[in-house]
């Protein structure tokens, strides 16, 4: 019980306690799902697009919560995410895949400036070309 209360507090969703799942918004339901996973005190947490469906207030809260949990527990986190801004804020290491191959492994800021990453995801638009 104590761990559950801690996780709800860290995620900023103590007000959702006791609300039936069917009464939650999509974003709130995702945060409750994350809380459920964190309550189990995992060694590693794998998340597929954790910010999907969250509103503009929930995303910063999610980022702050993940940073706090990582700092306090040492829980390793793997995110599968297409939101480059979120990745740059939340991650200390980025692996970029394109067409089934790894094209980058390193610092998030370096990934944003990597010509191979730009080319793979922006095509000619990354270099001022295009039609």
Regions inferred by a protein language model and the residue ranges of each:
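Glycine-rich phosphate-binding loops of nucleotide-dependent enzymes
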Residues: 1-131
């Amino acid at each position: 019980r104590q761990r559950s209360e801690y996780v709800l507090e860290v995620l900023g969703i103590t007000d959702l306690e006791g609300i039936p799942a069917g009464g939650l918004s999509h974003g709130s339901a995702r945060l409750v799902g994350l809380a459920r996973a964190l309550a189990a005190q995992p060694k590693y947490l794998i998340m597929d697009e954790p910010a999907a469906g969250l509103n503009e207030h929930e995303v910063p809260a999610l980022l702050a919560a993940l940073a706090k949990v990582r700092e306090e527990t040492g829980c390793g986190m793997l995110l599968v995410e297409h939101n480059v801004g979120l990745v740059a804020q939340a991650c200390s290491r980025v692996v970029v895949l394109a067409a089934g191959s790894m094209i980058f492994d390193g610092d998030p800021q370096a990934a944003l400036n990597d010509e191979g990453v730009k080319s793979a995801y922006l095509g000619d638009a990354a270099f001022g070309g295009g039609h």
